[in-house]
Every structure is written in C-alpha cells, then in structure tokens.
Amino acid sequence: MPAAAGDGLLGEPAAPGGGGGAEDAARPAAACEGSFLPAWVSGVPRERLRDFQHHKRVGNYLIGSRKLGEGSFAKVREGLHVLTGEKVAIKVIDKKRAKKDTYVTKNLRREGQIQQMIRHPNITQLLDILETENSYYLVMELCPGGNLMHKIYEKKRLEESEARRYIRQLISAVEHLHRAGVVHRDLKIENLLLDEDNNIKLIDFGLSNCAGILGYSDPFSTQCGSPAYAAPELLARKKYGPKIDVWSIGVNMYAMLTGTLPFTVEPFSLRALYQKMVDKEMNPLPTQLSTGAISFLRSLLEPDPVKRPNIQQALANRWLNENYTGKVPCNVTYPNRISLEDLSPSVVLHMTEKLGYKNSDVINTVLSNRACHILAIYFLLNKKLERYLSGKSDIQDSLCYKTRLYQIEKYRAPKESYEASLDTWTRDLEFHAVQDKKPKEQEKRGDFLHRPFSKKLDKNLPSHKQPSGSLMTQIQNTKALLKDRKASKSSFPDKDSFGCRNIFRKTSDSNCVASSSMEFIPVPPPRTPRIVKKPEPHQPGPGSTGIPHKEDPLMLDMVRSFESVDRDDHIEVLSPSHHYRILNSPVSLARRNSSERTLSPGLPSGSMSPLHTPLHPTLVSFAHEDKNSPPKEEGLCSPPPVPSNGPMQPLGSPNCVKSRGRFPMMGIGQMLRKRHQSLQPSADRPLEASLPPLQPLAPVNLAFDMADGVKTQC
C-alpha cells in the first residue's frame, strides 16, 4: 500500500546549496545506502505541514488560504502536497455557479482532458484531478514567478529582447496546441505565468467560450478583459479558425512592448472597438522599437485573417529568431508523451520500493500523462530532486549511481526478457539464415541460456548402454569431420541480433540437448527418443571368450513429456502399420501403432512422431503407407533397469549433443512438443508373464540405398 500522509517526516533539512559542512557531505552517501533519494528530497518536515495555512484538506492536498487568481466560476489557491511537501496550484471550480452557464457545465472537464493530451515546457503541467459533490479540483504545478501582467505593471513595459523571448515561448506553446488541434481562444496577459526560471507558462485553456470572449455573459467586461484580445472575425461573429490565437499573440506583444493595449475606445463599445481593428487604427508605438519588431507586430494584427500569418509562419519570423542561440523554434517539436529513457530512475525506484506503488502503475501513469496522485508524486519528487541537484552539482554524479544501473536492469529487462522468451526454434532459424552455421569454438565454451527445470527431472535421467562398435566408428569419423570444419571457419561474436547472450553453443549440462544443426534448445532428456535394446539373459565379462554376441536391433522408445516424466518409463506395443524411410542413416527403427500414439494438440491425429538418430547430420523422411490397416502386434522389448545416477552418456546416446539430426520437414519446436503415451504394466505380476512369447531374433541386416528405405528384419 502507498505510504500514508506524514510517513517519512523529518526535521527541516538544510536548504539546497546551503552550508552544512560534514553533514551535507555525508547526507548523499547515507541516502544512497538506505534510499534511492536524498533525505531532503524524500522526507517532509513536520514544521512545513504544521505552518502551512489552510482551511481544508482534499485528498493528499491542503487547500491554502492564499488566493492566486479568481474568475467567474473558479478560484485558484495555493496548495500543499502532504506526501512530498511541495506547493501546488489548485483550481477550484464551483459546480453550483457553473450550472448557471450551460456551456461551462457541458465543458467542465474539457480543460483537464486537453491538458492530459498536451506536454510542453511552456504549458502548465496538470498533476491531479479531484471531484467532490460541490467542487471540481484541478491540481497544477505552481509557478512561483507570478503573473506576467504584474511584471509589466512593475516595469511599465518590457525591453524588446525580453519581450522577444516571451513571445517566442508563447508562440511555441500555441503552435504545439494547434498541432494537436486545440485553439486556446483566450490568450491574454493574465493567463501567462512565470516559473522559477523566468519562462512562460500558459494556463487556463479549455473553459473559455465565445460568450465570455464577446463580453455578453459578463456585463462588467472592460477593455482589459477578453474582448480587447479577441480577433475581429470573432467580434463580428464570423467563422473563425486557429488564426484568432495569432491575433491575440499580437495584442500580448503590444502589451509587453508598450504596457498598454493596441486598440482602446472611450467609452467602451464593441462596435467602436471592432471598427478600430478593421481600420488598423492602432495606438502609437514607442519610437525605440526596431523596424523588425514593428513589422512583425503589424503582421500579427492584420484584420484580414487571409493575409494574417498562421502560427508556423509566425514562428519562423526573422525578428523572432534574431540573436537566438538555440535551435530554430519552427524545427523543434515536443512529444506529448515522455519516453521511457527520460524517466527518473531514482524517483521511480523510490515510489516502488519505499512508497509501495506498483512498478507498472508508476511507469504507465507517467508515460501516458494521466492526471492522478501517482503522476503528482512523480512530478513533484522529480522537480524536488532537480532543485536539490542544481544546488549540489558536486554530488550529482555520485548520488545514487546504483539506481541508474538498477534502472537499466529493471526497466529494460522486460524488453530483453520478451525477446529472449520468443519461440526458440524460430530464433534459431533466423540466426541460421544470417550466419549459416555456428562456429564450433563457441560450442566448447559451455555457455548456454537455459531454463530452470524441476528437481524430478534430475532424478529420472536415463542411462543408456554403450552402442555397437560400428556405430561408434561412424560417430568418431563424424567427430573428426567436425574438427576439420572448425579449423576452416572464423569465429562469430557472442552476441546475437537481439542483444542477448549467444544461445547457439554446446552445453555440458545433462538437462540440455543440443543439435549439430545449430538448433540448440534446453529440453529435458526424457522428452527425446531413447535407444532401448533387448535385455540379454547373460552378459559376458570383459575377459570372456567364445562366440561373439549378436547385435540386437536398436529401437527408439518414446516417453511422455513433462506431465508424466516423474513416472516409470514403459514400453509400447509396436506395429508395422507405419513405414519409415531413412536416407543416409544406418540405424534400425522400431515401428509403432498409430492408434496408441498420443500427439500434441498442435499436430493432427495420425501424424508421425519425430525420431532422433545418433548421427550427424541425418535426413529423415516419413511416409505413411496405410492409415486404415489394422494394427498388428509383433512383439515387445522391455528396457533394462535404468539407474537414476548413471555415468555421463556416451556419444551414441540420444542425450549427447551430437546425437540428434536435422529434420527439414518440421521445426525443432514441433518435434519437442510431441507427447508420447506409454503403457503401464500391471504391478501385481512381472512384465514377462504378461508378454507373448518372443521369437528368437535373427541377425540385423541393414541395406543402404539412397532410393529405397532401410529394411529391418526381426
């Protein structure tokens, strides 16, 4: 649960940048050890909450007694966020008064919706939205610089360079609004605030209406109100567009340079005011203004909207960009959504680890710019941290450096884990298409991106008998061929195209099966076919002499997948209903009954099970002779007892990394997902009693032909 109000309160710390001696030097180190933020940033002094003058509390905000502004239906008051100790501006809209104006009632929530759509450095940031039975609250960032109108009153008028800076920022904000399809319609000096860095902050858009601008709903409207900033087409009730904001910018520019309004009439009359605008009877301009400023001002106050420049043309004006050291404003665009790389890792980690918010909630809220208490906490803590670091630049690099590394691991891990969790055989094919084959030098490193397996799999690992001598000879020849290829190939980087660790390497783990066709994938050995030989009644010793023992045909026993690997392995009834055609592989394959085979959900009934042959590489093709032929039981072969902790498997074992062949007819993922069902022998009587008598086995005759299949005779 998020921390309650008042948690983390502490005494008043030293101001950022102030003297503190050893205490200030030790505070950053202590903050890094136990917290992701300095104590001055994460803590809230009790005196700050106690001394703040307020008359009520709404949510996590104290509504202060100081009034920042007032309108017809709303009042802007200073507030305090109790969780961060930061001051905010709270716009309180009286619902009862707003009901008197149907337009305001209908568009009451439009301002909050628009501000959540927009992000710009010269537009106030909306932090939170609250609503009660009688009031509607908009919590925004506080602009300590006050109103621009107050600054003009103090200075009488602004210098041309200072006014140019403000106008450039105002046009940039309006251009961003127009790009998003928003027309402010109420640009005036009172709606231009200044932040702590003396930058323009545009406020109060979304609630203005035509009636308020025209002055009909408010009989006390004067020349200092909205009608003095309205464009001629708006006063004439003609069809208007975004260029009405360009006219209002011209009025604001005139007010900054002269301290007065460009068009005034005595006594006030809308008809007389409109006539002055159309006739271009502008009040006199100061003589010290440059010709560029006068020319630009007259173009903005053009009464004909067709001849008036649009906001993009105004932003590209030569006078506006004169002596401007930054990028040309018309070429600068601001995204309405913050990117993941721009998130403050220290603030996000503090909110998730200390305040108890979910990591996904914090990131999604900030990235979507959704006004709520999570966005308010993040914005205020981040601003507080920036203010702290600006006063202590010497510890900016050392402050919570571990949080930057932690942020990389924690917030970029989902992207890497998503890429790493792609289907393995699909990534194998993509990698194989680019780099053809993996160098064998990487196989010896033993690095393998494997998955954790259950402990039951480690206990049930099967052991296999030594294969025949002829098979071992062919495997050794294949191994020598691989060594020759390894010497002729160059090494490849250890990183794949996804930026992850190279998974195409040989592994020494018995739980991982690797293929010589570069399709390396972690799978438990019980999921692969196992070579099972007929048990012999007598095993001669190493030194025994006599007639050499006949080699029994090898059969592949398909075992169950993950759901049944903890049970004992059993033998299935074999049937000659399927004919396997093997090319270039001297191995005898057992036939199985298709009616007793359990397939994975992704394969149709009657499809063939994949077989793993102990050669490299082996091309296997499957042909189904007769689906309707009845199954015929020929015989069963029982496996020898399998110890749980057997020695390391020989090269001829299917568990060996070089014992699987490439199957071009299906992907490695499909082959490994096949599930095979085995028969459970009765436990009350031995297996030999339930089996039919076995016929003596004849020597195995293997015929190799590229056109014909391998024929096995039992």
From Swiss-Prot:
Keywords: ATP-binding, Kinase, Nucleotide-binding, Serine/threonine-protein kinase, Transferase. One of its GO terms (cellular component) is cytoplasm. It is an enzyme of class 2 (transferase). Its EC number is 2.7.11.1. It comes from the Eukaryota. PROSITE patterns: PROTEIN_KINASE_ATP, PROTEIN_KINASE_DOM, PROTEIN_KINASE_ST. Belongs to the protein kinase superfamily. CAMK Ser/Thr protein kinase family. SNF1 subfamily. This is Hormonally up-regulated neu tumor-associated kinase. The gene is HUNK.
